[in-house]
Amino acid sequence: MIRVAINGFGRIGRNFARCWLGRENTNIELVAVNDTSDPRTNAHLLKYDSMLGKLKNVDITADDNSITVNGKTIKCVSDRNPENLPWKEWEIDLIIEATGVFVSKEGATKHINAGAKKVLITAPGKNEDGTFVMGVNHHDYDHNLHNIISNASCTTNCLAPIAKVLNDKFGIIKGSMTTTHSYTGDQRLLDASHRDLRRARAAAINIVPTSTGAAKAVALVIPELKGKLNGVALRVPTPNVSMVDFVVQVEKRTITEEVNQALKDASEGPLKGILDYSELQLVSSDYQGTDASSIVDANLTLVMGNDLVKVMAWYDNEWGYSQRVLDLAELVAEKWV
């Protein structure tokens, strides 16, 4: 079992903690949290969540220096500079880097300098040792080579399993993606300054077009797709659950039924638990709290001219993604030597 600390107790940090609390027989131990908020505030936000509801059957208390969950003490510290954190003293093995700030190798290395052994970035990284999407390229993780790793983005985690199935089965020539994405904390509640003039506009009353590197990032986990994919995002006035609209030109001629069958087979086989498949007539709120990275909405699959394929898939961009962060952390623990 390895000792884990969370840096940044925001949406992903707290979702990760809840995932960890709910998982049996995990091989990681959550021992510390670094966040700018105080332990009592963080304990309250962990217990009461607008999306996830109240954390039931869990006793949570806090004091000036820790949060206690069912008798288990999680140490708390508050320092914006990772190099000042007591990771060596607390014998921390792995940092879950969830601030969205220290996403570069240079930034994440500050945790290593403070005594941690490895860092898992919960966002697209910059010059990291490796990016891994569970179910797609997680088998490439090498304990001896990969000390600063990225779990990619929630959208890449939704898109990559579908891209893998379509590329393996039909061969992707090129493609584009649009994610209809719930608003996030990076946007403004009311109009206010932002480096992205569209994200500067009120999130809860606008459809906000913005950039995303999620499609290009697929090439980090499926190298043969480098230069073949791109995409955009539409941030919409919902607090959680998003949807990918993926359109590709394929080499092998096909029909809608064959595409859906390939996706269904993958969801029941090699990608079980990562990719899900649904023929139900559902809407976004029905997928709140879904563990899978990607849920194909089979009724929306289209094929035009036997070579233009459109697949749409839901994803819980907080909970589903946090489950994959935990999966990757457990993989790191499994490979620890």
Curated annotation (Swiss-Prot):
GO cellular component: cytoplasm
Transmembrane segments: none
EC number assigned by the record: 1.2.1.59
Keywords, sorted A to Z: Calvin cycle, Cytoplasm, NADP, Nucleotide-binding, Oxidoreductase
Tree of life domain: Bacteria
Positions annotated to bind D-glyceraldehyde 3-phosphate: 153-155, 184, 199, 212-213, 235
Site (Activates thiol group during catalysis): 181
Residues the entry annotates as binding NADP(+): 11-12, 35, 80, 122, 317
Single Gene Ontology BP annotation: glucose metabolic process
Pathway: Carbohydrate biosynthesis; Calvin cycle
Active site residues of this protein: 154 (nucleophile)
Matches recorded under Gene3D superfamilies: Dihydrodipicolinate Reductase, domain 2, NAD(P)-binding Rossmann-like Domain
Role description: Gap2 has a major role in carbon fixation as a component of the Calvin cycle. Catalyzes the oxidative phosphorylation of glyceraldehyde 3-phosphate (G3P) to 1,3-bisphosphoglycerate (BPG) using the cofactor NADP. The first reaction step involves the formation of a hemiacetal intermediate between G3P and a cysteine residue, and this hemiacetal intermediate is then oxidized to a thioester, with concomitant reduction of NADP to NADPH. The reduced NADPH is then exchanged with the second NAD, and the thioester is attacked by a nucleophilic inorganic phosphate to produce BPG.
Similarity section: Belongs to the glyceraldehyde-3-phosphate dehydrogenase family.
Subunit structure: Homotetramer.
Protein name: Glyceraldehyde-3-phosphate dehydrogenase 2
Gene symbol of the encoding locus: gap2
